[in-house]
């Protein structure tokens, strides 16, 4: 019996006059902001390559399509070995689906702990994307204090690009290296992350891997931005306001933002009497991070 995806793959094959042996069903193009992010990052990577190992941050709202755009960047740059490290392993399905279903990445191979394909059995002549959690790939064996045996291969490869996904989950630990010792992501997420300084951010010089480029992805990297971890030339921003503006100003048919809901932002002005009470204190002690903080797991 044929599935919906089988039919889509057949339609794609007929329309594009290809065998489509990998049954790919997606052929959409990048939206303007995705292309802009790729263009800006490529330009920075190429210009800064001589200075060391360039890094770049995509500060982009949820549903921007960071996964798809990151793959397009890798393809544009001609990268063949890409390592994706995430602080939330549950996003593996999005990374795998985008690579395995879009026509632009035909021939690319995806490897994770849940795939039958391994790095040793993969076709080394074709691009390879390896996905894993930061805790697993860069963690150490608690017994020996050395790299986990099953992950030694990750450290023997000089990667073309290392991508840190969901960076906001790992960017502001009091001691960032402690993440290596956490086997349970929930143990990490529930820790107190109120304290942050630039010194606490990830320093590529002590990562036990080798690579030529770093790409950081996050929808809310506020503390990393406030700390000065990235300079202006290393950041691409795309906010909800940018998206709404693009939706409103789109010219022509097939508006790619048409299906996105209208966003209404409301503010509240604190009464003067409350402001006076607050100003009587020695310090302004109100903190949004504390106001919205939560205790416990789940």
Region spans (language model):
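SF2 helicase catalytic motif II
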Residues: 134-136, 152-215, 220-221
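Interdomain helical connector at the RecA1-RecA2 junction of SF1/SF2 helicase-like NTPases
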Residues: 213, 224-298
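Walker A (P-loop) phosphate-binding loop of P-loop NTPases
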Residues: 63
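Short basic/glycine-enriched coil/helix segment immediately N-terminal to the Walker B
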Residues: 50-53, 123-126, 143-160, 206
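Conserved Walker A/P-loop ATP-binding site and its immediately adjacent core
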Residues: 67-103, 136
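Conserved nucleotide-binding/hydrolysis micro-motifs of P-loop NTPases
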Residues: 89-91, 135-139, 168-169, 219-224, ...
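ATP-dependent helicase/translocase motor core
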Residues: 1-59, 68-80, 97
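Inter-Walker segment of RecA-like/P-loop motor cores
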Residues: 103-145
């Amino acid at each position: 019996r044929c599935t919906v995806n089988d039919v889509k793959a057949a339609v794609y094959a007929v329309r594009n006059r290809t065998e489509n042996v990998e049954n790919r069903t997606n052929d959409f193009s990048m939206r303007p902001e995705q292309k802009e992010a790729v263009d800006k990052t490529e330009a920075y990577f190429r210009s800064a390559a001589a200075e060391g190992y360039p890094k770049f941050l995509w500060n982009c709202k949820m549903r921007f399509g960071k996964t798809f755009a990151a793959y397009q960047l890798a393809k544009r740059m001609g990268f063949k070995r890409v390592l994706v490290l995430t602080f939330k392993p549950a996003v593996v399905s999005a990374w795998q689906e985008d690579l395995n279903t879009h026509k632009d990445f035909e021939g690319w191979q995806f490897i994770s702990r849940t795939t039958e394909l391994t790095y040793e059995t993969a076709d080394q002549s074709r691009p390879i994307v390896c996905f894993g959690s930061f805790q697993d790939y860069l963690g150490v064996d608690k017994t020996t204090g050395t790299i986990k045996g099953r992950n030694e291969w990750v450290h023997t490869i000089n990667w073309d690009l290392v991508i840190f996904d969901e960076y906001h989950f790992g960017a502001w630990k009091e001691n960032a290296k402690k993440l290596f010792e956490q086997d349970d992501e929930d143990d990490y997420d529930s820790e107190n992350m109120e304290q942050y300084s630039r010194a606490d951010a990830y320093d590529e010089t002590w990562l036990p891997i080798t690579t030529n480029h770093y790409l950081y992805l996050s929808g809310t990297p506020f503390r990393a931005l406030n700390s000065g971890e990235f300079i202006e030339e290393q950041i691409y921003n795309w906010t909800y306001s940018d998206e709404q503006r693009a939706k409103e100003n789109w010219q022509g048919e097939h508006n790619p933002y048409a299906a996105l809901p209208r966003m209404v932002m409301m503010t509240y002005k604190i009464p003067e009497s409350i402001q006076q009470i607050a100003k009587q204190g020695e310090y302004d002690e109100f903190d949004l991070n504390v106001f919205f903080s939560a205790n416990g797991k789940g």
